[in-house]
Amino acid sequence: MSLRHLAVTLVLLGCAGRATGQSGERARPIPPGYGSLTQNDLALRMGNEDLDIRFIPLNPKITPLLARDAFQSLRSLVETHRREIDSVAARGGVSQPGLALVSFFSQRPDVRFDPQTLTLLVRNRVFRPMGVIPLTPRFTSQQLNVREQASALYLFEEEIPVDDSFTISYGSMTSDDWDRKQPILDRERARVSARSRTEPRDTGR
């Protein structure tokens, strides 16, 4: 092999190594305790004159990007309802359901809502919730007074693709803003990766 060919080969190998490192950065599990995002940073929103709806994907690929208190709050929420989650998943024949925290906020008195109307669109496939676990009493009544809130854990038959694009819908309302969150998530992944190598984990102690 000539020196010129050897130099070209080394350059190509170097580029391949860098590309692998970048893709591996996203694939590597994110250590908790180093993030700084808030729940609002992960939330999709949609609304009309009656309702505001907030949708937070509960995917371990992104929840460790949250600040410690926010991360622990969501982790505790899921673990508290783990038995119910596993029961719903088992009935649906799903081992790893997609999870989301969904909240409905009323804008006026006596607003009714239908939990099953909320859907997830992924790669032209519509997913309806396979199960809903109420977190507040108002969720069961499906009716809210002005400025009241009702929340629940939603289960879908597939994991929510937080590394890809997806759309949520409720009646005529939609939100496809997840793509716009990717730059925020990528920057936070890079910060978390750097902090995890140089700083002690934030345990709150």
Regions found by a protein language model. Give the residues of each.
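Bacterial N-terminal signal peptides that target proteins for export
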Residues: M1-A7
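Hydrophobic helical h-region of N-terminal Sec-dependent signal peptides
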Residues: V8-L12
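Conserved functional micro-motifs across diverse proteins
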Residues: A19-R205
